[in-house]
Design a protein with these regions (language model features):
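Flexible, glycine/threonine- and acidic-rich loop/arm segments that mediate assembly and lattice contacts
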Residues: 1-325
Length: 325
């Protein structure tokens, strides 16, 4: 006899309760960016409850100020210091479906429980991969996909990012603080390349003014690691290693390989100005099991849904290099 929806739902709930952390680790254990910024929340992490867009305040200029003498003129003008970027909601899902034939073939308590948990775990892996695959893309604001790191660092000055066209945001010195910062020179990865790229994204001296996270491919990471091991000039971040990600710390930058990083790329990010906004009701939320509405097929289905986007509050705090070997 087929299980009732109450029974299927109970099995699903038990799966998430009984396995505890192992279940939620599925969302984060294949991508360093997902682990570091979404699970460990080592960056911006907002949980809006709604709105048409995700509002992210940003600072791009200085207010009025200076030295003065008694009787001198003091300005009270208000510079337009704070503006806001607006990122659109992006929606991802993973599907779990059980056909009636599956239930017949998996009769018995153990078999049906295993079937349901396997299907749900696969839905978790699916939604995770969909998100992780888009972290590094260059899709426009209006795309259904996440507004990725390439969009942050490589989109042109006439292309909107976070709802702002870079040439529309001008600092008092005439520069464009909302432009993407990148290098496309074809060259080999080296410590010199890392230092020079980090300098292009330097906001100011101090612990929060420079990139502190580096993301690259396993191939490039191994090259960097080999250079540093020879010179014995690096340490390792223990928390990241415990999470299962090989890493090294070089000149206050945590550098790690991410399987989803595109070939030939290195991204240097400042975690104080980048992270995630995830809807309060959309952090891998589960829908109840329901009838599968498909012609000539009987079954039940549920979804794991995610609503959010990658957000940036200071675009020039990050830089990327392509064409590396």
């Amino acid at each position: 006899m087929s299980l009732t929806y109450t029974e299927i739902q109970a099995i699903t709930e038990d799966y998430f309760k009984l396995d505890g952390r192992q279940v939620t680790d599925i969302y984060f254990n294949t991508s360093f960016f997902m682990k570091h910024f979404m699970d460990q929340k080592k960056g911006l992490f907002e949980r809006p409850s709604g709105g048409e867009r995700i509002r992210v305040p940003l600072e791009f200029d200085e207010g009025q100020g200076g030295f003065y003498a008694r009787g001198g003129t003091i300005s009270s003008d208000d510079n337009d210091v704070v503006n806001c970027a607006y990122f659109l909601w992006k929606n991802a899902y993973g599907n779990a479906t059980i056909y009636d034939e599956d239930e017949i073939k998996n009769a018995g308590d153990y078999a049906i429980v295993s079937l349901i948990t396997q299907k749900v775990a696969n839905a978790q892996k699916t939604v995770t991969k969909k998100i992780a695959n888009q972290i590094y893309n260059q899709d426009a604001d209006s795309s259904v996909n996440i507004t990725g790191l390439k969009a942050c660092c490589f989109a042109g000055t006439s292309t909107q990012y976070g709802g702002i066209t870079p040439t529309d945001l001008v600092a008092s010195d005439g520069s464009y603080p909302w432009r993407g910062i990148n290098t496309t020179t074809t060259e080999g990865i080296s410590l010199k390349v890392i230092r020079e790229l980090a300098s292009t994204a330097k906001l100011y001296d101090g612990p929060k003014g420079k990139p502190n996270v580096g993301l690259t491919t396993e191939t490039l990471f191994n090259t960097i690691s080999g250079i540093l091991q020879t010179q014995q000039r690096f340490t390792q971040d223990t928390d990241t290693a415990k999470a299962g990600f090989t890493n090294l710390v070089f000149e206050n930058k945590l550098i790690a390989a991410d399987d989803y990083c595109p070939s030939g790329y290195l991204f240097l990010l400042n975690s104080n100005f980048i992270g995630w906004a995830i809807h309060r009701d959309g952090y891998f939320a589960r829908t109840p099991w329901a009838d599968l509405v498909t012609a000539n097929v009987f079954g039940r289905t549920m979804k794991i849904k995610w609503h959010g986007n990658l957000i940036v509050s200071n675009r020039r705090a990050h830089a990327a290099h392509s064409n590396l070997s």
